[in-house]
């Protein structure tokens, strides 16, 4: 729903009304409820309603030679109806001897790219495992997504303007409980997986 229908739209409102009715029944029975999300979401399309894409594989092919580097999009999955395999995060593997810092700087000069990091920089910033990421890590700005190259994305299945996630701008999410939360350290940065600890250890 959220991929295709923005907050406040009739379909989204009907969806949340349905969920709320079920939660109300659980609350009435005395259940302790906690809700959170895996990620946020933003519109990622231009003024014409078309996906607003930075094709990173194309850029690296032009810079380093065709297929010398390989861009990986973690959002890629077989079900592309919602997001067209476009997200605001990418990692890229570079050929041996390539200057990752220079290439990251070059990528940052592309309109729509918020930041590009070397492996060590990006993994430290986003708490990622170094051995699972490429030589560079890239995030786009709020309303842009990162793709590989145009011929590798099937846009025919996108029936609504693209909404997707993966960037720093998409990190903010709600966490709702039906009981007061107590005893959390004031400087604690809450993340979605903290919901289990909060429910078990910090509710009255």
Residue spans of the language-model regions?
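Feature captures the catalytic ectodomains and active-site-proximal regions of enzymes
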Residues: 1-204
